[in-house]
């Protein structure tokens, strides 16, 4: 029987300056065993009994060194099928707003980063679910859609 798992989170980190929002994208190191060299948003696995929110906050700190100013639960759950485990992974999405003056400190998983437009960030993603999710963050969270006020997580 196929399992359904939820041990992975994805986080879109963005800043706002001068009325423009920018998204953080990072390139995975070429020697990473999983998806080497691709551009991605923050993607990480939960540890122990941590909640998805706790894992998302930890991953933001570990992968970027940034401290979120605000956080939202994005009204989107990504998914993929893992053939090796015969499992469907359900991935909750989060968005965090960071201080535009803060310095990014990459983990060893990544070799470069850039702050870019939402459209460009989506075009860099290898996976259609990530492209779709980035659009939802732009429309609902950054764009002030109805979900923004309903899904903000107090920090």
Regions found by a protein language model. Give the residues of each.
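Charged phosphate-binding loop/patch that engages nucleotide di/tri-phosphates or the phosphate backbone
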Residues: 126-155
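Conserved N-terminal beta-strand and adjoining loop/helix that marks the start
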Residues: 1-24
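Short helix-loop capping/hinge motifs at secondary-structure junctions, enriched
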Residues: 19-20, 101-104
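Active-site segment of metal-dependent pyrophosphate-handling enzymes
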Residues: 61, 65-102
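NUDIX/MutT-family hydrolases
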Residues: 93, 103-137
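Conserved Nudix-box catalytic region and its N-terminal flanking loop in Nudix hydrolases
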Residues: 20-62
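Short aromatic/basic micro-patch
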Residues: 40, 88, 115
């Amino acid at each position: 029987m196929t399992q359904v798992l939820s041990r992975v989170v994805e986080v879109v980190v963005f800043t706002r300056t001068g009325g423009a929002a920018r998204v953080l994208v990072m390139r995975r190191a070429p020697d990473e065993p999983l998806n080497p060299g691709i551009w991605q948003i923050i993607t990480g696995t939960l540890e122990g009994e941590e909640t998805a929110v706790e894992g998302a906050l930890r991953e933001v700190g570990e992968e970027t060194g940034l401290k979120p100013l605000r956080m939202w639960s994005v009204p989107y759950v990504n998914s993929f099928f893992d053939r090796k485990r015969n499992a469907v992974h359900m991935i909750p999405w989060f968005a965090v707003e960071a201080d535009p003056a803060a310095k990014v400190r990459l983990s060893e998983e990544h070799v470069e980063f850039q702050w870019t437009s939402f459209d460009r960030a989506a075009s860099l993603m290898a996976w259609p679910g990530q492209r779709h999710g980035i659009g939802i963050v732009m429309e609902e969270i950054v764009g002030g859609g109805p979900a923004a006020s309903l899904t903000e997580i107090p920090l």
